[in-house]
Amino acid sequence: MESLLNRLYDALGLDAPEDEPLLIIDDGIQVYFNESDHTLEMCCPFMPLPDDTLTLQHFLRLNYASAVTIGADADNTALVALYRLPQTSTEEEALTGFELFISNVKQLKEHYA
């Protein structure tokens, strides 16, 4: 069975990446992919990690309102948006999930970055 990432690339009309799976979308949105046997994870840094705890708490509260999760990168320097799809997702579900993810990232960048 073909991987969900390859099926997503097919749905987008793109060739599968040969090296690091990364898509650069307009306005500097960089989507990194991490695929396991069970999930396809999409990750996009969208702004520097806030210095004050109130702003950080605001972003963490957004996790209750959306399927897109907000977290920090491994170096604690940037906020990242995360979205996971099960490997059992159809091509249509993967495309819909990707579009939802990109829409959420654009909104986050417009309002906060």
From Swiss-Prot:
Keywords: Chaperone, Cytoplasm, Virulence. InterPro entries: T3SS_chaperone. Disulfide bonds: none annotated. Its main location: cytoplasm. One of its GO terms (cellular component) is cytoplasm. The keyword Cytoplasm applies. It is found in: Cytoplasm. CDD domains: T3SC_IA_SigE-like (cd17022). The keyword Cytoplasm applies. Induction: Transcriptionally regulated by InvF and SicA. Also regulated by SirA. Homodimer or higher-order oligomers. NCBIfam families: PRK15202.1 (NF011749). Belongs to the IpgE/SigE chaperone family. Molecular chaperone required for SopB/SigD stabilization and secretion. This is Chaperone protein SigE. It comes from Salmonella typhi.
